[in-house]
Amino acid sequence: MIDDDGYRPNVGIVICNRQGQVLWARRYGQHSWQFPQGGINPGESPEQAMYRELFEEVGLSRKDVKILASTRNWLRYKLPKRLVRWDTKPVCIGQKQRWFLLQLTSNDKDINVQQSKTPEFDGWRWVSYWYPVRQVVSFKRDVYRRVMKEFAPVVMPLQEQVSMSRPSYGYRRKRY
């Protein structure tokens, strides 16, 4: 399902843990990493697509996460010309995405990137919040920056709660 402008409707998923870190997944058989994402099927809402992709790509279900936020608008990126399939009709020149910020409410052990018969990912790890903006492939970088900027007011308080719950081991200078 490609819109009149050549963009494929898609959802992107940012999963954070209680420490405010985000799940970063390695694409199957590649050295590139990204957030889980996937197309919206005809008749499917963005939220329904998000839950389907969540299960297909990382093996998590609705009971394993809590929706914290979603982007207000569709965010778009164009594919590099070398990745556009010019022989298909209609031609898809990029993705338009609705993004969801989820908090993992279950355990790390519930994450399973091998859930699908044709897995998208072969590994994953927790990374600091802003890390993906610098590391994602260049043509997705602007969308990632916009997503993370929009979600930051929700995630930053989580990080502050964690740092405030840790004991502070300050030191006193010895006076002579």
Swiss-Prot record:
Function: Accelerates the degradation of transcripts by removing pyrophosphate from the 5'-end of triphosphorylated RNA, leading to a more labile monophosphorylated state that can stimulate subsequent ribonuclease cleavage.
CDD domains given in the database record: NUDIX_Ap4A_hydrolase_plant_like (cd03671)
UniProt cofactor(s): a divalent metal cation
Family annotation (Pfam families): NUDIX
UniProt-listed SUPFAM superfamilies: Nudix
Listed GO biological process terms: mRNA catabolic process
Superkingdom as given in the UniProt entry: Bacteria
Full protein name: RNA pyrophosphohydrolase
PROSITE patterns per record: NUDIX, NUDIX_BOX
Organism placement in taxonomy: Bacteria, Pseudomonadati, Pseudomonadota, Gammaproteobacteria, Enterobacterales
Enzyme class: hydrolase
The protein's Enzyme Commission number: 3.6.1.-
UniProtKB keywords: Hydrolase
Family membership: Belongs to the Nudix hydrolase family. RppH subfamily.
Residue window of motif Nudix box: 38-59
Domain Nudix hydrolase: 6-149
Hydrolase among keywords: yes
An annotated GO cellular component: cytoplasm
GO molecular-function terms, A-Z: mRNA 5'-diphosphatase activity
UniProt key word Hydrolase: yes
NCBIfam families assigned to the protein according to its UniProt record, in alphabetical order: PRK00714.1-1, PRK00714.1-4, PRK00714.1-5
Gene: rppH
